[in-house]
């Protein structure tokens, strides 16, 4: 870990900060929810944090380069010295590996895929808003408590501040399913989803093996 920082402050004035922290060729350790599960580790090439005072407040930038985790950055300007605490900026992450989340979800047997996210940040520090796109490719999900194994999961979401559209597809066995819908969290959260599929494999050996068609709508 390398870094440097300069800071100054005076009565009646906002603090002035100029700091940078960089770490290279490190290892992240992830502990599982279940203590019996194996703890995983992942290497990263470089991670850095930069904080610098500007006329409008403070800029924060985070960069990550990690082939086994993902690459990307977040660059945000925030003014923490006024009541509203406004913020704006941008974020972009590419090839984020979903498997890094598996230790934090107890019911997941397998979780894989590549997640990409890019967009603009606005709003305030307490109520941030995001406008952007999210895409999942080559996903694979299997749950311990559910008799389905989802493969070739492809999911696209367009996020507009307080709502998001969802379009996706996946395989279960040789069957194909499509998922569409919207999620709105402006006031009370509302989820509207439609799942349609044919020849989907439902299997939990040795109890269940079945091929099903489905057309389900959810409005909650």
Q: Where does each model-flagged region fall?
A:
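Interface amphipathic segments
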Residues: 1-215
């Amino acid at each position: 870990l390398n870094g440097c920082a300069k800071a100054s402050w005076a009565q009646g004035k906002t603090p002035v900060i100029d700091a940078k922290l960089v770490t290279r060729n490190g290892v992240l350790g992830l502990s599982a929810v279940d203590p019996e599960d194996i703890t995983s580790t992942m290497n990263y090439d470089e991670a850095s944090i930069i904080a610098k005072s500007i006329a409008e407040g403070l800029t924060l930038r985070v960069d990550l380069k990690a082939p086994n985790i993902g690459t990307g950055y977040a660059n945000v300007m925030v003014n923490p010295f006024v009541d509203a605490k406004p913020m704006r900026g941008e974020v972009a992450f590419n090839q984020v590996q979903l498997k890094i989340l598996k230790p934090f979800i107890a019911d997941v047997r397998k979780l894989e895929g590549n997640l990409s996210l890019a967009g603009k940040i606005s709003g305030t520090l307490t109520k941030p808003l995001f406008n952007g796109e999210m895409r999942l490719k080559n996903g694979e999900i299997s749950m311990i408590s559910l008799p389905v194994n989802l493969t070739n999961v492809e999911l696209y979401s367009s996020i507009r501040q307080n709502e998001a559209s969802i379009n996706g597809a996946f395989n279960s066995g040789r069957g194909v399913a499509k998922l569409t819908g919207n999620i709105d969290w402006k006031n009370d959260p509302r989820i509207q989803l439609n799942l349609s599929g044919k020849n989907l494999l439902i299997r939990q050996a040795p109890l269940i093996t079945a091929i099903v068609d489905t057309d389900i709508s959810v409005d909650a």
